[in-house]
Structures are given as C-alpha cells and as structure tokens.
C-alpha cells in the first residue's frame, strides 16, 4: 500500500470537523495517470494529492473522478504538512504561510472553475437544504450569519454525475470565489462545523486559511 497521510483541513477551533484530504507523499508510488485516478476513486475523499517534488512543492490534485489544476483545501493542507512557502499545482505558483494557528494560501479567483454561489435569506434555509439539492453543477449555498462581522453559514454541493461526494465539508475554492464576489474578509462556517477564513488583497488575490490536523497515517 502507498504511504498515505489523511488530514482534516479547515478544522473548527476545538480541532473537530474539517474536510478529509488524502496525501501520497511519494508520488512515484503511483507513477501514471490511471493508477492515481484509481487510488483517488478508491479512497473517495473530496481530493487526494500526490506529491511529485516535496522540496519544490510540485503536486497533482485528484477528485474521485478527475484531475484538477487548482483546489483550495488540498493546498492549505499540503502547505501545513510540507511546511513550505510555495506550492506548484498545475495552475502555477501558489504562495503559503503559517501564522501559528492557521495555514494560508494566496490564490486568484479566476483559478476557481465550474462553481457558483447562491445566497439564501437565512441560515435556517441553508441548513434545511437536502444533500444534494436538485439541479446540476457545483453549488455553494450561503447566508449571512452576521453580515456586519462578515460571518457566513455555507454548504457545498458538487452535484457531479458520479454522485460520489453528496456534500463537501469545507471548500476553499468556493470560499475564494465568494470572497471575490463580496470583496470583503469572511469567517465561514461550512458543513457540520468547519471554519474557513478569507481576506481579499489589493492586487485581486484572495487569501484563504484554516486549521489543519492529522486524521490518520497509513503505511
């Protein structure tokens, strides 16, 4: 079996919740596209990442069904695990930092593909949504919990044809998109209780950050 770390990314303050992320630290153990996609499908996490060069931060991101050029929660998790300041997913250079509690990456909203946000009138409406709601395409449902404070309640629904992931527990890329649309810093509670923080930059970039913890390690 491949050496595999499983992380929880965007944990709550008490360390609970967070979105599971599979990390294969030595990408050479899955050298081709087919073996990587098969392992990502077998694990069934929102994303599994293969590290091709840990010093340079070269990584390959997979959902159970496809390869991704960019994704938020995998890169936040990897920045924490590898303790490096720059990552190299297919989209290009992504800068990272750690402030002692939260790990942050800096991204551009145009890197976020095939997602849309939808505002609801109340937190209760968001929490009452079935998983997934009717329709097709990636939906980030959200409502203000406290608009003055920038606190948001959100849920994420991939609504992909394969139906493997009914609801995403914490979605960094969707949080980036919402932050760009609102042009303000946000404190997002997503899913069962995961926490995502964001901050827009003057140059159009968005910082997204959260807590990361080990869930399991397999060898």
Regions found by a protein language model. Name each.
Residues 1-219:
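Active-site proximal loop and beta-alpha junction motif in alpha/beta enzyme cores
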């Amino acid at each position: 079996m491949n050496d595999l770390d499983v992380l929880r990314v965007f944990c709550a303050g008490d360390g609970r919740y967070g979105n599971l992320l599979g990390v294969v630290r030595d990408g050479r153990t899955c050298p081709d596209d087919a073996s990587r996609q098969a392992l990502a499908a077998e694990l069934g996490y929102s994303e599994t990442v293969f590290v091709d060069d840990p010093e340079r931060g070269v990584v390959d991101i997979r959902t159970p069904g496809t390869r991704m050029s960019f994704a938020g929660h995998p890169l936040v998790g990897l920045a924490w695990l590898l303790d490096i300041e720059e990552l190299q997913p297919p989209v290009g250079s992504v800068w990272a930092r750690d402030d002692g509690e939260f790990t942050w990456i800096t991204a551009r909203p145009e890197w976020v593909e095939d997602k849309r946000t939808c505002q609801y009138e109340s937190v209760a409406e968001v929490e009452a949504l079935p998983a997934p709601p009717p329709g097709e395409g990636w939906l980030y449902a959200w409502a203000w919990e406290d608009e003055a404070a920038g606190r948001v309640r959100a849920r994420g629904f991939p609504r992909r044809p394969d139906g493997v992931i009914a609801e995403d527990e914490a979605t960094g890329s969707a949080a980036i998109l919402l932050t760009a649309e609102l042009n303000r810093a946000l404190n997002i509670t997503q899913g069962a209780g995961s926490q995502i923080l964001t901050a827009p930059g003057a140059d159009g970039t968005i910082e997204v950050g959260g807590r990361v913890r080990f869930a399991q390690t397999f060898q």
